[in-house]
């Protein structure tokens, strides 16, 4: 970001912009919402709401699950994402009531292929890496990638990308064509 009008801040989102004095055209959250916890969803959406301009947009990119009230896998909780929580569609929608959901895209089926590609690359790189890591790490990382791929292949987990606006985009939101 050198030379760009960008500023990075490392902080707890709950301490960001408490008085709402800062306003942004766009807010993006990628791979973070899984660590918010369902008890804090409304607080997170409140922080975004007071931080985005009335005509601004928020991009929320998160892994989610199909059913509310189910916990995270104990192994994932212990070794990969301690205290991680996957939101359900119902939990997201209920918590985002102060926004218009302009777009909700599901990349879940694609994420299975992504995880399998990561697994293939990990296997191919392992001969170069095995001197830096032990056999336990190898087994755990394979287990993580393959189990996660299985949850997406079974369509139990999803990868969602939501575009939210405070008041709705005049004429409706149009996703940019790639």
Regions found by a protein language model. Name each.
Residues 11-27:
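A short acidic, Gly/Pro-enriched loop at the edge of an enzyme's catalytic core
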Residues 12-14, 62-65:
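Short glycine-enriched loops at secondary-structure junctions
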Residues 42-57:
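A short glycine-rich, Lys/Arg-flanked "PGG" loop and its adjoining helix->strand segment in the class I
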Residues 5-8, 58:
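Hydrophobic/aromatic anchor residues within beta-strands of the central parallel beta-sheet
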Residues 35-42:
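Active-site glycine- and acidic-residue-rich loops that bind
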Residues 7-11, 102-105:
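General small-molecule cofactor/ligand-binding pocket signal
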Residues 63-171, 178:
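Substrate-binding/catalytic lobe of Class I Rossmann-like enzymes that use SAM or dcSAM, i.e.
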Residues 28-33:
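A conserved beta-strand element that flanks and buttresses the S-adenosyl-L-methionine
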